């Protein structure tokens, strides 16, 4: 049996976090106040992540709610250790992000996923497998940085396709085609190599900037 951490949060960056899985029709729309138990380390990282996100999305209006499938869960793995969080949706005054809408809103999805990669060591998104279509799983089981693993490679392939016109298969395999496309993009951006989370974030030119949302240029 996984031991529930005593630590919990009900808001992040001053925004209420709601549990949206009590009823099927709540998903991505609304939720109930909830105590999200997790380690204090995870809470601290999530706090910084959402502060960063909301500072970059002033043009979206005031953030109103964060919707989640949960943090600590009584099961094996990072959730059972209180080190993982599932992000379903974020509501601002003028914009709504819902994880399940990735196929039709890739620009926004990838921008948020890029920021997740900047702050959290493991990010499992829509392309990872069908079980992750409806949420972004983030956890602190690994240090932040670039790794040639399927979850990071899938993000990389989607970003290269979406923002640089590549036609890579999003299969999570870091092969010759992906490496060639990556090197060409790094040359355009003036980045010698991808070794840090910041460099990984910069691959996506679709940026969440302070006060605006743009898909061109560098910050």
Locate the predicted segments by residue.
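Active-site acidic/histidine clusters and adjacent loop/turn architecture
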Residues: 1-66
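Catalytic cores and adjacent binding grooves of peptidoglycan-active enzymes
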Residues: 2-18, 25, 40, 79-85, ...
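Conserved short secondary-structure elements within globular domains
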Residues: 51, 55-76, 108-125
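Extracytoplasmic low-complexity/disordered linkers and repeat tracts associated with LysM-containing
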Residues: 218-219
């Amino acid at each position: 049996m996984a031991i529930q951490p005593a630590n919990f949060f009900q808001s992040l960056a001053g925004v209420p976090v709601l549990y949206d899985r009590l009823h099927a029709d709540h998903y991505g729309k609304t939720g109930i106040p909830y105590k999200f138990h997790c380690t204090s380390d995870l809470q601290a990282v999530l706090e910084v992540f959402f502060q960063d996100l909301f500072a970059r999305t002033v043009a979206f209006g005031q953030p109103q709610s964060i919707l989640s499938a949960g943090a600590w869960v009584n099961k094996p793995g990072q959730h059972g250790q209180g080190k993982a969080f599932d992000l379903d949706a974020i509501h601002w005054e003028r914009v709504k992000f819902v994880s399940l809408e990735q196929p039709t809103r890739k620009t926004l999805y990838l921008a948020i996923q890029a920021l997740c990669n900047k702050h959290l060591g493991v990010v499992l998104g829509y392309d990872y497998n069908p079980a992750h279509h409806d949420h972004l799983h983030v956890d602190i089981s690994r240090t932040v940085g670039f790794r040639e693993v399927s979850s990071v490679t899938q993000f990389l392939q989607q970003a290269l396709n979406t923002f640089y016109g590549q036609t890579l298969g999003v299969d999570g395999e870091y092969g010759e085609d992906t490496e060639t496309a990556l090197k060409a993009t790094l040359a355009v951006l003036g980045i010698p190599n991808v070794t840090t989370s910041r460099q990984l974030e910069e691959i996506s030119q679709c940026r969440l900037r302070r006060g605006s949302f743009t898909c061109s240029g560098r910050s």
